From Swiss-Prot:
This is Bifunctional purine biosynthesis protein PurH. The gene is purH. PANTHER family: BIFUNCTIONAL PURINE BIOSYNTHESIS PROTEIN ATIC, BIFUNCTIONAL PURINE BIOSYNTHESIS PROTEIN PURH. GO terms for cellular component: cytosol. Belongs to the PurH family. The IMP cyclohydrolase activity resides in the N-terminal region. Its EC number is 2.1.2.3, 3.5.4.10. GO terms for biological process: 'de novo' IMP biosynthetic process. Keywords: Hydrolase, Multifunctional enzyme, Purine biosynthesis, Transferase. It comes from Syntrophotalea carbinolica (strain DSM 2380 / NBRC 103641 / GraBd1). Residues 1-147 form the MGS-like domain. It comes from the Bacteria.
Length: 521
């Protein structure tokens, strides 16, 4: 453990840097700096030596060359306990640099701007910063390297307790963080530039680098014999399971997280009023709109109260005390998630200490584009997330849906998007009547939806039906007619569409095509 005597500070994100540098100066640390960081520290009354003065070589090429100099990197890489290194440093007038505080040009923030040009992106690729970070991290036995302002307090606390020194254990952890950071930084550059190698912007780069941060080790995975952990993206913006805050309850399990994600992403589809989604094994078993949250929950629960036992409940409005009371009195629930939770609701759910209560924040009505990943043995499938609802919805039958039927068709269509294929959803008056999920036969999914409705004591006649993919034969419409379905929404696109349309016309069923399939595997 060596005392910090000299620090090089050069940061783009200046959060907390003045206070940190002032503390370093209090330990007698000499501060080297560049450009805007040096100007800020001087403005705040701190003594700073420019790196150009230290190296005897000016900044040049519009600031592209500032710290790329042997006096900087020799001072970082020279091993203090290696006599040959020490002798060579003395021979060339190289002084040790004991600490590097550097964060990088904001490449990702720059390329996220709609008007970003290739030239803008190139100028925000940091060269000197990563080079210093990697040099310091390599020699972490002797050099403390700080890439994240959240680590300032930890470093200062250690210096306070050890006379201005930082332990090798802490240096090693900080060095690992540097390599993780620079790997992600280079990955972002590689991904962005890789899409621009041809004459046109490519949807996918030839290589893909992704980095996630571990936030939780889990007791086990999908099954008790599997180990598991939860990782999140480095910069999650939209409200999601990954941004949620747990207010109470047991630790989230692997299955809890997967199911809560399914429930929350489904309920995000409904902006027109209070909505509730109940999920079991990643499938919606009850979805409903209501005049208030309690009504939405009651209606969703009534769809399939048996499957709702031990389920996940998601809302699109602040969870209130009355709705929370209805839940805890009525059913066993694993997780409740909402954009906000009232103080009264927190008190109510606290009576069931094991229930996991999550608050995720509100989301925009128009979700941002993102990728979906699916791991296969030896590879990774990457696709655009299925964020679009439909193409051009058009009636294809003699009878056109009524306004009320059209509302229910669009409601069930949004639900079907989140049901495992083959998916059939029956709905009426803004609630699901029956859900048929995950069957190899579309007709069997329809049968299951009918069975679910019957078990729940709900009437299918007069309902509408949504199918996540086209009907390959007319039997789907024949069975729908027998069940009393009055209107159908489906993508269309079968070679037997005319036969299916004819069947709908024979039964007086109104049918619309969306032109967009929503398989979910």
């Amino acid at each position: 453990m060596a005392v910090i005597k000299r620090a090089l500070i050069s940061v783009s994100d200046k959060t907390g840097i003045v206070e940190f540098a002032r503390e370093l100066a209090g330990y007698g640390v000499e501060i080297l700096s560049t450009g805007g960081t040096a100007a800020l520290l001087r403005q705040e009354g701190l003594a700073v030596k420019d790196v150009s003065e230290y190296t005897g070589f000016p900044e040049m090429l519009d600031g592209r060359v500032k710290t790329l100099h042997p006096k900087v990197h020799g001072g970082l890489l020279g091993m203090r306990e290696n006599p040959a290194h020490v002798a060579k440093m003395k021979e060339h007038g190289i002084e040790p640099i004991d600490m590097v505080v550097v964060n990088l040009y904001p490449f990702e923030a720059t390329v996220a701007k709609p008007d970003c040009t290739l030239e803008d992106a190139i100028e925000n690729i940091d060269i000197g910063g990563p080079t210093m970070l990697r040099s310091a991290a390599k020699n972490n036995r002797d050099v403390t390297v700080v890439v994240d302002h959240v680590d300032y307090d930890q470093v200062l606390a250690e210096m306070k307790g050890s006379g201005g020194a930082v332990s090798r254990g802490t240096n090693f952890k900080l060095a690992v963080k540097v390599y993780q950071h620079t790997a992600a930084y280079d990955g972002a550059i590689s991904n962005w530039l890789g899409q621009r190698m041809g004459d046109e912007l490519a949807d996918f780069s030839d290589t893909l680098t992704v980095q996630f941060k571990k936030v939780q080790d889990m007791r086990y995975g999908e099954n008790p014999h599997q180990k598991a952990a939860f990782y999140v993206e480095r910069d999650v913006q939209e409200a999601s399971i990954s941004t949620s805050r747990q207010l109470q309850g047991k630790e989230l399990s692997y299955n809890n997280i997967a199911d809560t994600d399914a429930a929350l992403e489904c309920v995000k589809q409904f902006n027109e009023g209070p909505a509730c989604v109940i999920v079991k094994h990643a499938n919606p078993c009850g979805v409903a709109l209501g005049s208030n949250l309690l009504e939405a929950y009651n209606r969703a629960f009534s769809t399939d109260s048996e499957s709702a036992f031990g389920g996940i409940i998601a809302f699109n409005r602040e969870l209130d005390g009355t709705t929370a009371q209805a839940i805890v009195e009525r059913q066993f629930v694993e997780v409740i998630i909402a954009p906000a939770v009232s103080a009264e609701a927190i008190d109510v759910v606290a009576t069931k200490k094991n229930v996991r209560l999550l608050e995720c924040g509100y989301w925009p009505q128009e979700p941002g584009a993102r990728y979906d990943f699916k791991r296969v043995n030896g590879g990774l499938l990457v696709q655009d997330a299925d964020l679009l609802l439909s193409g051009d919805i058009k009636p294809v039958t003699k009878r056109v849906p009524t306004e009320e039927e059209m509302r229910d068709l669009l409601f069930t269509w949004r639900v079907a998007k989140f049901v495992k294929s083959n998916a059939i959803v029956y709905g009426k008056d803004g609630m699901t009547i029956g859900v048929g999920a995950g069957q190899m036969s579309r007709v069997n999914s329809a049968r299951i939806a009918g069975i679910k409705a019957e078990l729940a004591g709900l009437e299918v006649p007069g309902s509408v039906m949504a199918s996540d993919a086209f009907f390959p034969f007319r039997d789907g419409l024949d069975n729908a007619a027998k069940a009393g379905i009055k209107a159908v929404i489906q993508p269309g696109g079968s070679i037997r569409d005319e036969e299916v349309i004819a069947a709908a016309d024979e039964h007086g069923i109104a049918m619309v095509f969306t032109g967009m399939r929503h398989f979910r595997h």
